[in-house]
């Protein structure tokens, strides 16, 4: 489970409600008891539920029921029902709706990608990158995990990933073996992941025996060719495809033999459509 602190939950609420709801105050309805319900109009893999519930309880509302993160909801299914005073209900309305719409959009997009991949490779995986929309990293992470995806890198400090931009600063930027050996010496408990931007680089990298080789923006034909020769050059190396991988392009790579894909596309998926209903207790 991705942990969001109370301060982060408060920040999500404060984006919208720091001044309260003027309309509710002006109508003098804030003291009334009522319910709020969130429905997913189109169905799909849901996430953001636990965060949404924390936001609602922070406002003093009581959660009556909620689905689980990662569950497949039907079109029109209720995701959350909560109760409390109308002032709190109206304060939580849009802030929670925004979190649910964005999170569910991310998780359902990735779930569709995984379903497509696993029709061909049941053991296939999709890892999502650090390139999330600024300020959404933790929300993005919970959405990715809810859909069954992997976190590619949560940050720079705990994983090794050798890019061309690192190699540019080396004395010999084509010395893959030297760079990989140095990384193994100075980070002996870490897997060595490297990225190649062209087939020639990929072959040179494979000869240096990395643990994982990322192929960046390779065509399906180029990826297939590298996948065919990789076992003879580096039998223990895992191949991954990255760069431009999304729900539309993924199908073009399903014949190349690579089972690990790296993408940031789900972060930019269309938000889900969440319907919200607020009603006084007497009408429920």
From Swiss-Prot:
Enzyme class: transferase
Gene Ontology annotations for the cellular component aspect, listed alphabetically: cytoplasm
Family: Belongs to the NadC/ModD family.
Keywords assigned by UniProt, alphabetized: Glycosyltransferase, Transferase
Residues of the signal peptide: none
Record-given protein name: Putative pyrophosphorylase ModD
Single GO term (MF): nicotinate-nucleotide diphosphorylase (carboxylating) activity
GO biological process: NAD biosynthetic process; quinolinate catabolic process
Coiled coil start-end: none
Entry-linked NCBIfam families: modD
SUPFAM superfamilies (UniProt xref): Nicotinate/Quinolinate PRTase C-terminal domain-like, Nicotinate/Quinolinate PRTase N-terminal domain-like
A Pfam family that the UniProt record links to this protein: QRPTase_N
EC nos: 2.4.2.-
Additional record remark: Orthologs of this gene seem to exist only in pathogenic strains of E.coli but not in the K12 strain.
UniProt key word Transferase: yes
